[in-house]
Amino acid sequence: MKIGIVGAGNIVPDFLEASKNIEDFEIVSISATENGRERMKKLSEEYGIKNIYTNYEDLLNDDIDVVYIAIPNSLHYEFAKKAIERNKHIILEKPFTTTYREAEELVELAQEYGIMLFEAISNQYLPNYKKTKELISELGDIKIVQLNYSQYSSRYDRFKNGDIAPAFDPKKSGGALMDLNVYNIYYIVGLFGSPQKILYTANIERNIDTSGVLVLDYGSFKCVAVGEKDCKAPLSMNIQGDKGLIKVIGTLNEV
């Protein structure tokens, strides 16, 4: 399987490291903006990537089977759509798209072209999640679920001084909900399905949510998901029932 990577941000080395453990998985190409050329060069030398491009079309012209898209959130739809129309399978970084309608259109288009389209979020495939799902029936009636994903961003100080990275740019669909709280959402919805009601309250700076509290109302119980890029706290999850408690300390994708 031949892979082309779009983007050269912080998540890409993690993807490249993981790819070492997959048989018949060859990273052929990487594409980013001109500003990312030096970083692409470094990655290509370290991981043996043959081709470097600053034009996405050049990457799509390569002999590749799959495109891994790891670029600002606002570009996911556009780049994924082009890849589908070129008959490339897609691994799309989270969040899948900026809007529900964009997600619907990509899924419909992928089905039309017979393309496999994946979102690169791992929570629901890891032992931690599977063990939680296995034990949850022992808790009795669920009453309260609390999740906290707080991570003081390495870009936050620059953001306060006016240097706006994509993760803090409202025009690029950044913010705490899209960047961090999305992990909590996947965990909750994976365990309990869709809520009846949703309320999101956020701390706003420069028109972006730097932290926020998401309340998911399931009728008989409530879930509270906190995502913060402007402060830090121990990462944790509590699922409380009338007969027991599941408590996780650390990121939800840890074992």
Regions found by a protein language model. Give the residues of each.
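Receiver (REC) domain switch-region micro-motif
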Residues: 30, 67, 145
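N-terminal Rossmann-like dinucleotide-binding module
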Residues: 1-47
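Beta-loop-alpha module in the N-terminal Rossmann-like domain of NAD(P)-dependent dehydrogenases
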Residues: 36, 47-109
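Predominantly a Rossmann-like dinucleotide-binding segment in NAD(P)-dependent oxidoreductases
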Residues: 123-195
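Rossmann-fold dehydrogenase core element
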Residues: 104-122, 141-144
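Glycine-rich beta-alpha junction loops
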Residues: 34, 124-125, 148-154, 204-205, ...
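Contiguous beta-strand/loop segments that form the cofactor/metal-binding neighborhood of enzyme cores
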Residues: 185-254
